[in-house]
């Protein structure tokens, strides 16, 4: 299944490096740091990084998620400051990435470095039906480890 999304390039350097899927099975498109200069993220610091692009999904049955890149988080402690970025279908502004250095060492971020990934997901909007009680289930109200570890 394929979806066509309107993309506005805000940084001319991206014209030759648009996000693309690395493999046929890839779910995420890499987003790049469209900064003018190298930036240093000190331990514990969070900064907003422009991606140089805007998208408009237009269809309320879709949303985009900005997620961390696994290598940056595991090897360098660079994750998203908001953990997940949710891009609503009607948002048209530049995609920004909140980068947080949860590591113990400073991290050097170079211009056009891949910093996060964008995943397009289907969305179902819910209507609420108010009830006095739920039909009983096997789990009931058990949570937070109630099903065990093994």
Curated annotation (Swiss-Prot):
Cofactor(s) the protein requires to work: Mg(2+)
Organism: Methylobacillus flagellatus (strain ATCC 51484 / DSM 6875 / VKM B-1610 / KT)
GO MF term list: dUTP diphosphatase activity; magnesium ion binding
Binding site for substrate: 69-71, 82, 86-88
Catalytic activity: dUTP + H2O = dUMP + diphosphate + H(+)
Protein EC: 3.6.1.23
Entry function: This enzyme is involved in nucleotide metabolism: it produces dUMP, the immediate precursor of thymidine nucleotides and it decreases the intracellular concentration of dUTP so that uracil cannot be incorporated into DNA.
Entry's family note: Belongs to the dUTPase family.
HAMAP family membership: dUTPase_bact (MF_00116)
The protein, known as: Deoxyuridine 5'-triphosphate nucleotidohydrolase
InterPro entries associated with the record: dUTPase, dUTPase-like, dUTPase-like_sf, dUTPase_trimeric
Keywords, alphabetical: Hydrolase, Magnesium, Metal-binding, Nucleotide metabolism
Metabolic or biological pathway: Pyrimidine metabolism; dUMP biosynthesis; dUMP from dCTP (dUTP route): step 2/2
GO biological process per UniProt: dUMP biosynthetic process; dUTP catabolic process
């Amino acid at each position: 299944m394929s979806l066509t999304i309107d993309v506005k390039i805000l940084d001319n350097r991206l014209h030759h490096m648009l996000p693309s899927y690395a493999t046929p099975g890839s779910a995420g498109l890499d987003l790049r740091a469209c900064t003018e200069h190298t930036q240093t993220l000190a331990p514990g610091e969070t900064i907003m990084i422009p991606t140089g692009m805007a998208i408009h999904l237009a269809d309320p049955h879709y949303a985009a998620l900005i997620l961390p890149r696994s290598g940056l988080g595991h090897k360098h402690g660079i994750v998203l400051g908001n953990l997940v970025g949710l891009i609503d279908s009607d948002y048209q502004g530049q995609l920004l990435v909140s980068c947080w250095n949860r590591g113990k060492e400073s991290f050097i971020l170079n211009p056009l470095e891949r910093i996060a990934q964008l995943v397009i997901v289907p969305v179902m909007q819910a209507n609420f039906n108010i009830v006095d009680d739920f039909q009983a289930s096997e789990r009931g109200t058990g949570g937070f480890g109630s099903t065990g570890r093994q």
